[in-house]
UniProtKB/Swiss-Prot annotation:
This is Dihydroorotate dehydrogenase (quinone). It is found in: Cell membrane. FMN binds at residues 61-65, 85, 139, 170, 215, 243, 266, 295, 316-317. Belongs to the dihydroorotate dehydrogenase family. Type 2 subfamily. One of its GO terms (molecular function) is dihydroorotate dehydrogenase (quinone) activity. InterPro entries: Aldolase_TIM, DHO_dehydrogenase, Dihydroorotate_DH_2, Dihydroorotate_DH_cat, Dihydroorotate_DH_CS. The keyword Cell membrane applies. Substrate binds at residues 65, 110-114, 170, 175, 244-245. The gene is pyrD. Pathway: Pyrimidine metabolism; UMP biosynthesis via de novo pathway; orotate from (S)-dihydroorotate (quinone route): step 1/1. One of its GO terms (cellular component) is cytoplasm. Monomer.
Amino acid sequence: MSGLFETLGRRALFAFDAEQAHGLSIAGLKTGLVTCGAPNDPALSVKVAGLQFPNPLGMAAGYDKNAEVPDALLKLGFGFTEIGTITPRPQSGNPRPRIFRLVEDRAVINRLGFNNEGHDAAFKRLSQRAGKSGIVGVNIGANKDAEDRIADYVAGIRRFYQLARYFTVNISSPNTPGLRNLQARDSLRELLSRVLEARNEEGKMCTLKRPVFLKIAPDLANEELDDIAAEATEQKLDGIIISNTTLSRAGLKSAENRDETGGLSGAPLFDRSTIVLARMRERVGPDMPLIGVGGVDSAETALTKIKAGADLVQLYTGLIYRGPNLPAEIVRGLSAAVKREGVTNIAALRDRDTKDWARRELSA
């Protein structure tokens, strides 16, 4: 079935503009007719940041920006899904066209700019699924014109605290001017301090401690990774997601669209994001949860992320090229890998190749 989608379904969707195709796929999931889940395998269940995930594969933020189809995504076989990025006020993002396919590279360049319907719309939709099972995280961001961007992140924590199973603080999108500056040590210290203070205050009121993850860029120098690791450890952050899209265009084959401005995702991001993942694992040690994102499009690439240091993995662009059967295909492949490797749980495979990946050189 996956092969059938790649030849027929993808051809049909790719006849549309990339953003139109995205809207059509959301509409398709809303029908409830697309269900391709894999059976639960206890060997894939992992406990991360106090949450029990049925399997380590998640849907990355960016697809379900406005919390329209979280449960439909879980039915595809994902162990968790992440909505957003959500900003306090609605914003339209950057002018169209702003999503570009690089088919030969199985990649996408986007410069969306946090287009979303805002807190109110997402809150209303998530409230309708309150009490349902399934781990749904909320990825929070800042409005482009915010005078105090950190206040926007704090507002996200407070608004969605009862509904989110975890939060992701997104300071690594390259499409909001100046946003990545929040990754600098002094700015990051203030950001994490205020966000975690809000989390702790909300947690005391309802006796629930929601994990907070930080999503970082793959274009950071080793010294910048040092600073992020130190600050995350010092402030007892719950985990780090590695990584967002890259500004690098190293090794691309596609002639069409390669020079478009924006962040690159998909297969070409795999090596870079995995190297940064491994380097961060070496810096934070064995206890801090890390989530690997970037170029995951098969059980093999998901397993490679885990062996490089990831507790969980996420994908998005792979779904564009491989179709809705991909999550179940990966989950089945990970089950087979656990048996093949002779371990009782997927977590036992983490860090097996961390040193090797951390030593690799990043392409310019």
